[in-house]
Amino acid sequence: MGAMQAQNYSMVKWAVGMRLKSATIQTVEKALREGEILRTHVMRPTWHLVAAEDIRWMLKLSAQRIISANDSFAKGYDLDIPNELYTKAHDLLEKILCGKKSLTKQEIAEHFNRSGIVADNRRMTRFMARAEQEGIICSGEDRGSKFTYALLEERVPPMPELTKDESLA
């Protein structure tokens, strides 16, 4: 499947359905709900849909470049977050999402704020993007029109690790 990018969630689901034999909107939505297809920022700060089986090797190829670009951009907007704070945020994400829980960004922000991590919308975007890039979180099961996040390790079973050459092939 590769990665499919779109600004509009309905259109990217349609794009997936168009590329798969005998897919319907229902089968695409079921695959998203069950974590067979993930919604992520794997290649840049735009939504992509990827097959769950591909997420780890894609992150391995792209994450460091995306993290560096995001950090550079953030410094220009006074959004620089120290690595120690990312570590604290990641530890909290693992704690609050453990047990196959899926939470919205707003629910996660409430946990962050209660734990002393300032979690306004701009900072939450940074925390969530970094956690995605580091393979800590991925998309959870949507709640109506609200996106949720879950732990990658709980949502996607382990896959054989690919070499860089295999990933690029």
Tell me the role of every PLM-derived stretch.
Residues M1-A169:
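Long, low-complexity intrinsically disordered regions
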